[in-house]
């Protein structure tokens, strides 16, 4: 206030005003400051000063032919003086106004296409809803967030190649467009931007916004998807927040969200299979998200989440060096430790073998709803400063930190036995045993931890064992803070290795991730996830398993048919029949299998009993380990729709219905595809027509390899011999004719020869 009075006083003296407005600036340092270098030192002042002049703009000479010298009001629009140092004309801002009102109009068709990201943003804001403003303390933490909605996920290099190809197709320089997305985008954009008059540089900038993910490290206290980040300045201040619902989704957020769901489902499923790593890879390679291959998304998408990172590690991609424990991301900020095996006794006198970290270390812990700074020594928590959205979230963070500290009082707080198992029914490792135990009930842990008197520190309060805040006392070493802890900002990625059980380690051998760390939360994906792998059939329940199993048999019928007659055991062991077993009542699985296998053997032995529909219908039942018994069945039970439903051994049922006239198969009323029966089942002797051009030599001869299906015969060279599977599961040896002339007689002789060869 005093300063302002003093300044007012000075300004009231006429001499002061004169000095400030009239005297020249002749101090060399000042002149140097404002005249050296190309960088404008005071842009806003320069702009105001320029615009105060009569002709602040320079333009190409052609302007004098396109714009009149004076406007309707008689004001001069351009000066006859040319600009010093260039052959351009000096122009008044009024000329711009004249041009905007009266200048030529070009086509506007390309604007929405080039400035797509802006048009889309306007639509989202138009349809978005802003709710009330709440005043409260905002716990913001810096997170790496995506700042431009609606982008594809190309790398900078890939995008550069696409932009060059679209905007400057005639420029020299090698451009390699390899990925599917690059080619699709290039084709689409070239068509959209035909005859586009917008400056190529502008088009290039806008394309970059559409193609590349841009991230910033920003303080956020709420939604982190890009449609929330674009309105960050409207939704959260230092002491207020405004509720907001976006007026539309964007594909990049949908992909991130769906990728996490797919990865979680796949890791959970792989963990319970015989070879988790192989299963995980098989599923990643055969899954599509919104029509794009999951492996392509994983290669490009920087989302960091436990399940996603396990999938990336399995594919040999680099991931972040932070590790995960109890759903929190830990990043060591200082210190170091060595690992040593140690045996400890729980409060229940159970022996646990834990890997103790010896040494002083500091970590940041970042979770979905709480963050913390942890300082620990060997088996001792030195200090934990935690902040979170609510009491529950803060408690979660405290439990994780206490377990992670490996303190003795934590291990002694265990009541009862530790025998938690994972989805595959294997015992969890000791650290996760402890974690699960205290996540169920942490009362004893908090009671036994110990409390201490605390000093009054700004922004920090103590917390008592019952989670109430206090300014005098607190659990030992633990404080709650108003300020959040920032996420780890570095985008550095490290090489990791993964073992058969999906444990991911860094090059020092520290475990960064394991399936135990994968969240059990189930969400609904925003994009369609198509799991082609049979391991994921059960994700949509028993009906889906039933339909998928039969669809698989129909799709692969040609090869299935050959295996059925040649190598049934190999067929029965196919992993595609695994999910089906869960539908068959456990007590009778073995008997069903034995019965069906015997039935199939009879079909192979007795001529003319081959029945396509029946084989397809019963095949999945033969996959279980068979029990030999004399039992005969007229129907087999499957558990779907919450009860046992019957599949008739002979004939149709609601579960399995084949319509002979339309050739359509319906499973539980759902269409499962077209089934082409073998020709001989309806009319005998049709193979003879199919085998025209081949000479039948006699019975199957194993030296000529496995039996081919009739469709595969066309690949044979003239004179080449092969075994071929004909109609009723019979195999004969044939030779492709060397001359075409004798083809006509094949039909008559084939029928006789087939009968001879078989009998």
Swiss-Prot record:
It is found in: Virion; Host nucleus; Host mitochondrion. GO terms for molecular function: RNA binding; RNA-directed RNA polymerase activity. InterPro entries: Flu_PB2_2nd (IPR049110), Flu_PB2_6th (IPR049114), Flu_PB2_C (IPR049115), Flu_PB2_CAP-bd (IPR048298), Flu_PB2_middle (IPR049111), Flu_PB2_N (IPR049106), INV_PB2 (IPR001591), PB2_helical (IPR049113). The record marks 627 as: Mammalian adaptation. One of its GO terms (biological process) is 7-methylguanosine mRNA capping. SUPFAM superfamilies: PB2 C-terminal domain-like (SSF160453). GO terms for cellular component: host cell mitochondrion; host cell nucleus; virion component. Disulfide bonds: none annotated. Keywords: Cap snatching, Eukaryotic host gene expression shutoff by virus, Eukaryotic host transcription shutoff by virus, Host gene expression shutoff by virus, Host mitochondrion, Host nucleus, Host-virus interaction, Inhibition of host innate immune response by virus, Inhibition of host MAVS by virus, Inhibition of host RLR pathway by virus, Inhibition of host RNA polymerase II by virus, mRNA capping, mRNA processing, Viral immunoevasion, Viral transcription, Virion. A motif (Nuclear localization signal) lies at residues 736-739. Influenza RNA polymerase is composed of three subunits: PB1, PB2 and PA. Interacts (via N-terminus) with PB1 (via C-terminus). Interacts with nucleoprotein NP (via N-terminus). Interacts (via N-terminus) with host MAVS (via N-terminus); this interaction inhibits host innate immune response. Belongs to the influenza viruses PB2 family. Plays an essential role in transcription initiation and cap-stealing mechanism, in which cellular capped pre-mRNAs are used to generate primers for viral transcription. Recognizes and binds the 7-methylguanosine-containing cap of the target pre-RNA which is subsequently cleaved after 10-13 nucleotides by the viral protein PA. Plays a role in the initiation of the viral genome replication and modulates the activity of the ribonucleoprotein (RNP) complex. This is Polymerase basic protein 2. The lineage of its organism: Viruses, Riboviria, Orthornavirae, Negarnaviricota, Polyploviricotina. The gene is PB2.
